[in-house]
Design a protein with these regions (language model features):
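Active-site catalytic microenvironments for nucleophilic, acid-base chemistry
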Residues: 111
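Active-site recognition of the HExxH zinc-binding catalytic motif
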Residues: 93-105
């Protein structure tokens, strides 16, 4: 009986106190809210907010050494604990700007899914998938930086609107590869 209680307590501690997921996957129709930003602002940062987004991927390799495409999982994620804002410096445009960063990551997750679907993998699948990922990730980072530069981190409202439209068009273009 004591063993059963001890096992029950250990399971409660192990699973009962687990925090919310460390990442939040991109979902169509779901927009970020300020409550999703749970991190603390970087000391000395001149920015009003920062969203930490990226792409995660998981693959299964068959006994032949080739990736099983049907079991591949590619997601764009938002990382709440690494994302933050300064309440006194934000407005509705700031949140839209941060959402566009998340949407850019989703565009690249779709591009990654498309590349995987079209690629003919060999027994060298692990290296091949890493090459594809590195190329997509480089493109994602470049686009994120270009977005911030051209919109002046959400200050240039006209550039912001153009970028929002551009990213929405890309989401539509890559819709067949939505998660």
């Amino acid at each position: 009986m004591k063993s059963l209680v001890l096992i029950g307590f250990c399971l409660f501690v192990l699973f009962g106190f687990q925090r919310k997921s460390a990442r939040m996957p991109w979902r169509d129709g779901h927009s970020l809210r300020w409550s999703d930003f749970q991190g603390l602002p970087s000391k000395g940062s001149v920015f009003s907010a920062s969203s930490n987004t990226g792409i995660s991927h998981r693959f299964t390799i068959k006994s032949t050494g080739i990736i099983d495409k049907s079991k591949s999982i590619i997601k764009a994620n938002f990382y709440p604990k690494l994302s933050w804002y300064k309440p006194e410096l934000i407005d509705e445009f700031t949140l839209k700007h941060e959402q566009t960063h998340f949407d850019i990551s989703e565009v690249h997750a779709r591009m990654f899914r498309k590349a995987v679907a079209e690629f003919r993998f060999t027994r060298n699948s692990k290296a091949e998938i890493q090459r594809i990922y590195k190329k997509i990730e480089s493109s994602r980072r470049k686009m994120q930086n270009q977005f911030d530069a051209e919109t002046e981190h959400s200050v240039n409202r006209e550039a912001e609107r153009l970028w929002e439209a551009k990213v929405q068009a890309l989401l539509h273009k890559y819709q067949p590869w939505a998660g």
